[in-house]
Amino acid sequence: MYKNAEYLLEKYVEEKDQDKFKILEKIYVPNAKVTFEIDTDTISFPTEILGNKNIAQVLSAEFNRKYDHVQTYYLSRSFPQINDFTISNQGWLVIMREKEDNSIRVGTGLYDWIFEKQVDGNLKISQHNISIGVMLCLPGLPFSFLNELQSKLPYP
């Protein structure tokens, strides 16, 4: 099912953005760990999340209660693979709307991933670091602006 890292990373974006947390939890090993490095005060996450179910809950279910029309994009389709089980400094961009005030959010940062090969040959995520460098809050813009931005980029 998840035989290569590129496919797994596409599934991560789709499941996280579309609030499919039950599927998202399946791409992480049960004892997976997600850590955060956040260089902005316009968004917050816990310092770390332990366990695939907790990860899926925070990154998908809770996140999608606060934001909608979430689309995350990889800034390069060439994943900077260190070896078969590690990808480092994968640039990303997210464009979304905050439900509370309808402000548009645009953020960027880096992902680092460590994968584990399972007995069945599939890869799963064992460690994931999310660095958020910028998270702009753009209040007062029409919803059409969000659609226009998202329509110009290949997803995921």
What is the role of each PLM region?
Residues 51, 107-109, 154:
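Glycine-centered flexibility motif
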Residues 63-69, 99-106:
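Short, solvent-exposed secondary-structure boundary motifs
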